[in-house]
From Swiss-Prot:
Gene3D superfamilies: Ribonuclease Z/Hydroxyacylglutathione hydrolase-like. InterPro entries: Metallo-B-lactamas (IPR001279), RibonucZ/Hydroxyglut_hydro (IPR036866), UPF0173 (IPR022877), UPF0173_UPF0282_UlaG_hydrolase (IPR050114). Pfam families: Lactamase_B_3 (PF13483). This is UPF0173 metal-dependent hydrolase THEYE_A0282. NCBIfam families: PRK00685.1. Keywords: Hydrolase. GO terms for molecular function: hydrolase activity. It comes from the Bacteria. Belongs to the UPF0173 family.
Amino acid sequence: MKKLIFLLLIILLPVASFGATEITWYGHSSFKIQTPNGKVLLIDPWLTNPANKEGKRHLKELPKVDLILLTHAHGDHIGNSIEIAKETGAKLVATYDLGKAIVKYAGYPEKQFGYETTGNFGGEITLLNGEVKILFVPAVHSSALEIPDSPKSLIYGGNPGGFLISIKNGPTLYHTGDTDLFEDMKLLGLMYKVDIMMVCIGDKFTMGPKRAAIATKFVNPKMVIPMHFGTFPMLNGTVEEFEKEIAEQKIQTKILKIKIGETVKIE
């Protein structure tokens, strides 16, 4: 049975009352978002990552999935996307280059990706009958698709990115994807009221705790969820270090610490 953490966000979120939006973290950068109307989005769904000991069960217990959002082409972010898509019929939300590569070389069902669910950085799409708006946001990383049996071992997967997800009668979420700190993050803080930011803190392949804290300051969300840490020993940035940096930089954002497999319900 999944643990549910019920959060009262009267102070943390705007005065207008949200419907219930549920966020589940599966470890690494993998999240499930369930909207107030019951629509299900998965972001970078690698449920069976090494840090998630219940990953196979979580994968089996997934409800119908409406959308799979992929930030870039690396295998630890494509994860279980292909099998989930084949099982549930979930449509793929990705940049055009990334989507085409995943369909052609990784086996994502072709009929589940098209112009309806694709875009590029700075562009916004509205899906699920207006239930969600998704803005494509750039990231500073890489995005090669590794196909061991292909004549080319690395396939071009477009540019890496993140997503700003606005949920009708719910919060606005920013998933950074894998990235370093970059100054244009300030624009998100200026142009949007971000309620929850999912930020990578693991270091080595992304920014670590110090730079992630500065990114949080730039975006200025109400709450932040640290991610992409501890999956492998080399991703050694910690939540404790992130907390320390947030405190030292006098950033007012609340850190929302979710255990792997837990769900937070935002009302």
